[in-house]
Amino acid sequence: MIPKNVIINVAKEVGFDLVGVVAAEAMDDERKGFEEWLLEGNQSTLAYLERNVEKRFNPTLLVEGARSIIVCAVSYLSPVSRGYDATCRTKIASYAFARDYHLTIKEMLAELAERLGHEVEGLRFRAFTDSAPLAEKSLAVRAGLGWIGRNSLLVTPRYGSMLLLGELVINKAVDSYDVPMQGVGCGSCRACVDSCPNRAIKPNRLIDTRRCISCRTIEREGEQCEDIGLDGWIFGCDACQSVCPFNRHAPLHSNPRFDPKIDISRLDEAAWQGMTNDDFLAMAGDTPLVRSGLERIRKNIGK
């Protein structure tokens, strides 16, 4: 059995801002809500969300011998996360200016597992970061990191919602497990709902991906509402996060691995239109921007 304080201390030393630990078990209530969301068609072109639903909400089906899950979060909040000038037509979600978080967090989780392996004999693990069907936000809530805001994102008291999640599923029990937060939440605040240009935020903390700018600028193109626009966003969208009071009062990130690699001040429309693919890859080769590619980003300009 692993002492929880050892896990937390090592995870913080690795560079995570928040850490919680939960038992690996089925999350039936959360699965029911997700299945209802799917039945309403909110997933749009995100067909992968329809697969492996049972595994998504039961980690023991994903990882043989799973006993515990270490849930980690790290802030990426930077000055650009506070919002753009209203006239900007080349807005990019602030997480995309840094190295691809899938790579960085996987490295951090591997370091965490290696260091814990020195403390615990026979430790086996599997690392996740938005890379397999695992209900990350549900696990984060169960681990006491925060709550689900009206915009469907995890919100935390100290760091707001500009966070990236990673999980380590391990084969060992822990001496104590965390529980969900009590007495905190969004209250009557509707800033995120009111700020969404396309009314993508539905009641009950749900998102209609057909209207969500982040989905429309990044994911596979397909069915969408006729009245949708991109409001100047060309990759992702921070509209519902930049207005959140918890983000406005959160500290900027302190982990240098998430420092922006791209100078946003030079990326106006003319810069994008005059950029070659080689220029693009040299600038953004290991950032999330390559997921869309230069042609798709240009196509989003002016929509």
Feature roles, as predicted:
Residues 155-180, 206-226, 277-281:
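Short, charged low-complexity linear segments at domain edges
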Residues 1-185:
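Auxiliary alpha/beta "docking" domains used to position bulky ligands
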Residues 26, 191-214, 220-223, 229-257:
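Iron-sulfur cluster-binding cysteine motifs and their immediate structural context
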Residues 282-283, 290-303:
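Long, compositionally biased charged/polar accessory segments in the mid-to-C-terminal portions
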Residues 216, 220-235, 266-290:
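Short Fe-S-cluster ligation motifs
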Residues 188:
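SIR2/sirtuin NAD+-dependent deacylase catalytic core
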